[in-house]
Amino acid sequence: MNGDWISGGRENLRVLIDYKGSGFPGGQMQDDLLLFSLRPDASPNPLALAVVNFPPIRGKRSLYIHRLSGEAPEDRDVLLDAIEAFARRQGYPVLYLNVMEQEMSYLYSRGFTVSPDCPIAAREVRR
């Protein structure tokens, strides 16, 4: 399915970002999760979804795309662009992505390098 069929044009698409953070009472808040969704206006059904969290990777707090899904590659690309813009503003130098549900050709064509020892791909954030 793509946005043209639902909304009459891709110009009516929006990237929605839902934030979840947590903290102990009186303590500092921490970022737990961002959910990015690409939706046509007035549609409850997303065309693409991405779940982002912030685990330590290689000793540093990192931006990790736990899930990136959507039928059309161009819809996933819209979310990748939004996530990369967020990463750039927040100072994350690398995007990490779980490769378990991804086509390798998609990852390589988007500039990701796949780790040989774990199911993670990485790409430097473009400045």
Language-model segment annotations:
Residues 9-37, 41:
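Active-site rim helix/loop that mediates acceptor-substrate recognition in acyltransferases
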Residues 72-85:
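Conserved acetyl-CoA-binding loop-helix of GNAT-fold acetyltransferases
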Residues 30-38, 42-74:
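Conserved donor-binding loop and adjoining core beta-sheet/short helix segment
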Residues 100-118:
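Conserved active-site alpha-helix within GNAT-family acetyltransferase domains
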Residues 68-69, 98-101:
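Structural motif
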